[in-house]
């Protein structure tokens, strides 16, 4: 992906939206220097193979952006971003799309309100793209030299906006519908998600089968218990009916699980219990003008790059009921010949969970990882990758 393509991706996906006027974004103040102005001449670029840029530049000159998902939200996120160009305009646009003050909720909470699926997904989406604005302001070469992006669950929408596949307001609208539909589906069935740290001999699929049989013995029809996230070797998230997850916790030693922990989410995301949410999201995506990404974006569903707009339409809806193949995505992005260096990796958005996962998937790639702080007001990119995930 050439530098010019990466530039036009960002201007098309976000910066260009500022020039559309009141329909989506306020017109920027006179003299404001933002992504749109900087990249105004970045048009007409020819597309190349996704990693062609790395053939012409040292790997360390290239960058990869990772966008976090639900669970990374924390009261105060966005505080460290408000002094950067365009960020307040992003939150103003979000208020019009959502119908409530997302910035106020992100900054002041309360946490239990922010944690609701209907609120945290839009909050993470906007904070992540605001973090990109901060990164662009401090290190514009990172945006110019980006060769790939990936997002965890709802983070995939932010990655696609960054890559120019959809406009900010349209992407946020899709996230809003997605979050509302997932919240409603979650409330229909007592369900949840269980983080499981296993061992090489752990029997994840057998454990899920046993848990489903246990639920059937209790009279639960069509019980759900399945792997919903592949995080890193021997670590999975299993989702399903609450009774199934309690069974797994009680019998963790039988399945060689080292540690289990219930996640603070409202339902069994990325399982068939989310099927009621598929149609609302599918209809919402029909209203979104999706374009081919100009920076390679990897799908959660199969850990391969998106190829065309129809691909995106289909897989974003399918993602709701499919496991997130994040471990496989990390291998797809960072696998390379022995002796070849790694790109810089930036986690853009709240938390450092994706950095911790990258460390467990690929230690060498993690050595070039940084997190863009969304909490502090200090004007720097936080380069400490060792803080544990929240």
UniProtKB/Swiss-Prot annotation:
Please list the residues that make up the transit peptide in this record: 1-21
What biological-process terms (Gene Ontology) are attached?
fatty acid beta-oxidation; fatty acid biosynthetic process; mitochondrial small ribosomal subunit assembly
Gene Ontology cellular-component terms listed: mitochondrial matrix; mitochondrion
Domain of life assignment: Eukaryota
Molecular-function GO terms, alphabetical: [acyl-carrier-protein] S-malonyltransferase activity; RNA binding
- Pathway info: Lipid metabolism; fatty acid biosynthesis
> Where does the record say this protein resides?
Mitochondrion
First-listed, main subcellular location of the protein, grouped into a coarse class: mitochondrion
- What EC class is this? transferase
Q: What is its EC number?
A: 2.3.1.39
UniProt feature coiled coil, ranges: none
Mind listing the UniProt keywords for this protein, alphabetically?
Answer: Disease variant, Fatty acid biosynthesis, Fatty acid metabolism, Lipid biosynthesis, Lipid metabolism, Mitochondrion, Transferase, Transit peptide
Name the residues annotated as catalytic in the UniProt entry: 153, 270
Q: Which reaction does it catalyse?
A: holo-[ACP] + malonyl-CoA = malonyl-[ACP] + CoA
Q: Which residues carry this modification: N6-succinyllysine?
A: 314
Cysteine pairs bridged by disulfides in the record:
none
For this chain, the family text in UniProt reads: Belongs to the type II malonyltransferase family.
Q: What does this protein do?
A: Catalyzes the transfer of a malonyl moiety from malonyl-CoA to the free thiol group of the phosphopantetheine arm of the mitochondrial ACP protein (NDUFAB1). This suggests the existence of the biosynthesis of fatty acids in mitochondria. Also acts as a mitochondrial small ribosomal subunit (mt-SSU) assembly factor.
Disease per record is: Optic atrophy 15: A disease characterized by visual impairment in association with optic atrophy. Atrophy of the optic disk indicates a deficiency in the number of nerve fibers which arise in the retina and converge to form the optic disk, optic nerve, optic chiasm and optic tracts. OPA15 is an autosomal recessive form.
Q: Can you name this protein?
A: Malonyl-CoA-acyl carrier protein transacylase, mitochondrial
């Amino acid at each position: 992906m050439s530098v010019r393509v990466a530039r036009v991706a960002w201007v098309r996906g976000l910066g260009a939206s500022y020039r559309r006027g009141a329909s989506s974004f306020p017109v920027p103040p006179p003299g404001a220097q933002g992504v749109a102005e900087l990249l105004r001449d970045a048009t007409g670029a020819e597309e190349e193979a996704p990693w062609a840029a790395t053939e012409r530049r040292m790997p360390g000159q290239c960058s990869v952006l990772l966008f976090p998902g639900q669970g990374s939200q924390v009261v105060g996120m966005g505080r460290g971003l408000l002094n950067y160009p365009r960020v307040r305009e992003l939150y103003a646009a979000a208020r019009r799309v959502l119908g409530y003050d997302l910035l106020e909720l992100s900054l002041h909470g309360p946490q239990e309100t922010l944690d609701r699926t209907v609120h945290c997904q839009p909050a993470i989406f906007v904070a992540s793209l605001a973090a990109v604005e901060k990164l662009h302001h401090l290190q514009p070469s990172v945006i110019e030299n980006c060769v790939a992006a990936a997002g965890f669950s709802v983070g995939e929408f932010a990655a696609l906006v960054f890559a120019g596949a959809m406009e900010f307001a349209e992407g946020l609208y899709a996230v809003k519908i997605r979050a509302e539909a997932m919240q409603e589906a979650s409330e229909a069935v007592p369900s949840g998600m269980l983080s499981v740290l296993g061992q090489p001999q752990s029997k994840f699929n057998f454990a899920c089968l046993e848990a489903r049989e246990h639920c059937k013995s209790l009279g639960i029809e069509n019980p759900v218990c399945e792997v919903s996230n592949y995080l890193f070797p021997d670590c999975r998230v299993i989702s399903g009916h609450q009774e199934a997850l309690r069974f797994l916790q009680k019998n963790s030693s039988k399945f060689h699980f080292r540690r289990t922990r219930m996640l603070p989410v409202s339902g069994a995301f990325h399982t068939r219990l989310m099927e009621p949410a598929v149609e609302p999201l599918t209809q919402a995506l029909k209203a979104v003008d999706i374009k081919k990404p100009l920076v390679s974006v990897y799908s959660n569903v199969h850990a391969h790059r998106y190829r065309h707009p129809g691909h995106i339409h289909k897989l974003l809806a399918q993602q709701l009921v499919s496991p997130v193949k994040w471990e496989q995505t990390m291998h797809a992005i960072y696998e390379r010949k022995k002796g070849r260096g790694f790109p810089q990796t930036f986690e853009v958005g709240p938390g450092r969970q994706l950095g911790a996962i990258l460390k467990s998937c690929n230690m060498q790639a993690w050595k070039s990882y940084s997190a863009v702080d969304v909490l502090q007001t200090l004007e720097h990119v936080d380069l400490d990758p060792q803080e544990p995930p929240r």
